[in-house]
Amino acid sequence: MSLNLAALAQAANEARGLGMDAVEKAASGHLGLPLGCAELGATLFGHAFRYNPDKPEWLNRDIFVLSAGHGSMFLYAWLHLSGYKVSLDDIKQFRQLSSTTPGHPEFRDTPGVEATTGPLGQGVGNGLGYAVACKMAQAHFNTKDHKIFDQKVVVLAGDGCLQEGVAQEASALAGHLHLDNLIIFYDSNDVTLDAMAIESQSEDTAKRYEAYGFEVVTVKEGHNIERILEAYEHAKNSTSGKPQLIILKTTIAKGITEVAGTNKGHGEAGVKFVAAARKGLGLPEEKFFVSKGTRDYFQAHKEKLQKEYASWEKLYSEWRSANPELAALLDSAKVTPDASKLFSVIPKFADAPIATRKAGSDVLQPLAKALPLFISGSADLHGSTLNYIAGAGDYTPKNTGGRNIKFGIREHAMGAMLNGFAYHGIFRPSGATFLVFSDYLRPSIRLAALSHLPVIYIFTHDSVAVGEDGPTHQPVETVSSLRLIPNLDVIRPGDHEETAGAFVAALSRTTGPTLLALCRQNLPNLSQFDVNARREGVLKGGYILQKETGALKVIVISTGSELNVAVEAAKRLGDGVRVVSMPSTYRFDQQPAEYKEEVLPSSCKKRVVIEAGVTPLWHKYVGLEGKIIGIDRFGTSAPGATVLKTLGITADAVVAAANSF
């Protein structure tokens, strides 16, 4: 399809009109980017991009991530014009309750939206994750005769995105990994929300990205479709082996003369000038107007794209016939792993005391072998988090099939990249660091939970038992604060077998992220209790580890490394004491009322909780009469056992609390 500049220019102005009308109707939203990047949208969606609006999950589609998610009407307008299932009525419901056009793009809610974005810079990390996943897919599934994967990943980012630390971490890693399938369009309009960008930035962005290892092209005429296309085609076909940054010099809110090029053009301030702007753009007074010419153009373009899809589908069918084992492996990406099958590949543990981080490593190896699409990364801590997949190789520019990813000391980029992997959907991502550093990637964890992404976090060194490193490295509030994130399953296993259950629980969950909080110090394997009961009990979040002898008098509840302390205390207390292990409050809370009553009968008011962390969240489980043994202060630097004793995380404390009723 030849380049039809007149049709694309008309479509750009009509997309501007849709943006203005939607924001005006909602009395809320951001006009700046949808108007400032309209020609970019026309170039990509109207000519250069490979997609199929009827098959939005096409495996080999080009990926578009709107990192500057506040400009969501840019994306909705182009999805509508391109023929995705985003209707004009959907556009009219922009930012309204239960609409498919929310204020910021949300994955799964809107066909064609590839990532949940809004917190600036996250989309850059997501794009990097997508790009690595695409490279890995090529390495794992392409053959000499059938190259079924060769797509590009395009990110649209603004000044705010590139100022954020997560984007800087991700960009540095993208250059290091030579991700030549990644193209970042930088909407360089020299404006931020508060003021002109020069008031908060003065670096040379082009030189910064060249230093990262990018090839950089600047398009001074950012509203010239021919120049944009030239830059995109250059980036797409470059043989430099580098990721690409295209700096697009644009005018924010172009079309609304009164606010264009100023920070007032960022939000909805220009709405009161929409009528004049519509006239200046050559649009009729009719709201939400799309001309027949634009409809016809995109229908013809859609037919062209569908021919490309049909050609690929033929290639894909031939690939499946020629490579049944690879086809089965690819199909497995859409199948939720069966917990019983996963348990069957994990060997039973010996009785020797080991840390749950080491138990995690022992569990991870057979599971990773059984699940060839499972990948594991670490923020420069594989040697401590022990989540390296033996024999799977490192992902490098020369080994793009490697399943271990070295993120470097870039926790935030790791979090955003893991989300990108999960959005991609073929590989099952996991990443590791120390639990106390989870705060460095919390925004990405939150977005994973919001987007229902099956990311697995392996966070070790989970309590004050870290010891000598002191309070900067001793998480006390961290586990509880993470439990507050909706749809995040935080599992803190108490021994080897519970660790096996935790990994299986994580891998068999596909509706959201799972966080495994593992300890540094050695723990006894509670081998006096049934192996399967411990493994499978984790799947329910909480279970009776040790049933009382005789009439029930006291319930002791515990998690993680304090579970053995609870068992020791129960032994000393004697008859009538029940020990409940609760590695996951999230899972336990989802159990039927009958099960929860069976584990924690309401008739028993005498309850004690022990966990080496802050106490407030435990009140719902002990009630007004219960006792909580925890740590409502920061830790201290000393050997781990000394710290635990000093802060009262002991069997003596549990016994004293139980006897105080």
Curated annotation (Swiss-Prot):
Pfam families: Transket_pyr (PF02779), Transketolase_C_1 (PF22613), Transketolase_N (PF00456)
GO biological process: pentose-phosphate shunt
The UniProt record lists the keyword Acetylation: no
Residues reported in the UniProt entry to bind thiamine diphosphate: 70, 118-120, 160, 189, 266, 437
Molecular function per GO: metal ion binding; transketolase activity
Region ranges (Disordered): 99-118
Domain of life (superkingdom): Eukaryota
Protein residues bound to substrate: 30, 266, 357, 384, 461, 469, 520
SUPFAM superfamilies: Thiamin diphosphate-binding fold (THDP-binding) (SSF52518), TK C-terminal domain-like (SSF52922)
Comment on bound cofactor: Binds 1 Mg(2+) ion per subunit. Can also utilize other divalent metal cations, such as Ca(2+), Mn(2+) and Co(2+). Binds 1 thiamine pyrophosphate per subunit.
GO annotation, cellular component aspect: cytosol
Site (Important for catalytic activity): 30, 266
Catalytic residues as annotated in Swiss-Prot or TrEMBL: 411 (proton donor)
Function statement: Catalyzes the transfer of a two-carbon ketol group from a ketose donor to an aldose acceptor, via a covalent intermediate with the cofactor thiamine pyrophosphate.
Protein name: Transketolase
Gene that encodes it: tkt
